[in-house]
Amino acid sequence: MSAPPPLQIREANAHLAAVHRRAAELERRLLAAERTMRAQAERLACQDQQLRAALDELGRAKDREIFTLQEQLLSSEATVRSLQAAVEQRDQMIQELQPRADLLQDITRQRPPLAALLATLEEAEELGPLPSSHSHGAQLLPDGPGPPLGNSMREEEGQDDQQPAVFGTTV
């Protein structure tokens, strides 16, 4: 075997050096890529952990808010039931008081004529009794009623104590 020519040896050495440099470059790039991937994986794991913690906190906050809203709903429903009971009670009271209200309305409608009648009666009382010459056994008006009767209210008050009259035969 003969030795390769020096040019071939130099070319082969240059080629080996280039392959060696290329391999070293690729190893450096591979190490850099691995470091980058590890750093990204760590960042992603950290972000994932942060997002999971935030998601858990949101879940707890949602559960607290749901609990609060359920309590408010129960309270509101109790208030509604209470108010409905109060409305029913007031409606019943209104139905019970309506006849009295109707009566009071009738009284207020009839009040002006009654007031006028009372004023007229007061005027009549202020006129006083008739002179005594006309009141003894004489009629005030021809073909009219006899002398006015006294106030019968005093007589009726005393009748409660008297025995009632019994009609029929006595034995």
Curated annotation (Swiss-Prot):
Superkingdom assignment: Eukaryota
Keyword Cytoplasm set for record: yes
Coiled coil region boundaries: 7-98
Region (Disordered): 126-171
The keyword Ribonucleoprotein is assigned to this record: no
Keyword terms of this UniProt record: Coiled coil, Cytoplasm
Cellular-component GO terms for this entry: cytoplasm; type III intermediate filament
Subcellular location: Cytoplasm
Name of the protein: Vimentin-type intermediate filament-associated coiled-coil protein
Organism phylogeny: Eukaryota, Metazoa, Chordata, Craniata, Vertebrata
Gene: Vmac
